[in-house]
């Protein structure tokens, strides 16, 4: 009773309210201290800007394609490929997803990939005269539509990071069409087959994320990069040895998983 008289109910309530205010201020201070600093936010956003530059590179590649400067077009697409290869590790290093939660790097990456991997190469395939004239526009439309559906497919990657089906790598397909320069009928049949294979559930090797035999894959990718640069510098006028090596690497990327599974079935 003495304590109750000393500390009246009104005063006790005031003490409680004051305590709650102090706790809330302390929590706000702690949350503020956990917020990313402006420099961190700027660095994280710069990664998104870097990724978006891939779309600008696609425009430059398209301008070269319209002029029928095919080797220059592929060189720009190669720059876009480098951006696509390194922006992800940088984003994970800087924790961009949490530092800049209002910007979706995944969506941005899909947008850039579609114009660099699909749209510009599709134009090159259709406009280059490599296909039968009657089939070229139809196959161009098929490339765009099936690739858009593939990009929206949540099953596009298997659990072991292999791609399911032909992974809409039309920049690579276009490169090989220019390299091989087959008769229009053969090239038309190849493009039609790749369109169909987009939805066939075979596994295509992801050059970076598949762990199995990564050392071999990365070595082959390095060789492929050197030979591809040489091919573009020569405007696709290379000898059969270079062509054979480039085709062998492409076949390994496309069918190594099926080959390994087949070999293991006899073990």
Curated annotation (Swiss-Prot):
Its cofactor is Mn(2+). It is a multi-pass membrane protein. Its main location: membrane. Its EC number is 2.7.8.24. InterPro entries: CDP-OH_P_trans, CDP-OH_PTrfase_TM_dom, PcS. Condenses choline with CDP-diglyceride to produce phosphatidylcholine and CMP. It is an enzyme of class 2 (transferase). Residues 64-69, 124, 184, 237-239 are periplasmic. One of its GO terms (cellular component) is plasma membrane. GO terms for molecular function: phosphatidylcholine synthase activity. It is found in: Cell inner membrane. This is Phosphatidylcholine synthase. Belongs to the CDP-alcohol phosphatidyltransferase class-I family. One of its GO terms (biological process) is phospholipid biosynthetic process. Keywords: Cell inner membrane, Cell membrane, Lipid biosynthesis, Lipid metabolism, Manganese, Membrane, Phospholipid biosynthesis, Phospholipid metabolism, Transferase, Transmembrane, Transmembrane helix. Pfam families: CDP-OH_P_transf (PF01066). The chain crosses the membrane at residues 43-63, 70-90, 103-123, 125-145, 163-183, 185-205, 216-236, 240-260. Residues 1-42, 91-102, 146-162, 206-215, 261-267 are cytoplasmic. It catalyses: a CDP-1,2-diacyl-sn-glycerol + choline = a 1,2-diacyl-sn-glycero-3-phosphocholine + CMP + H(+).
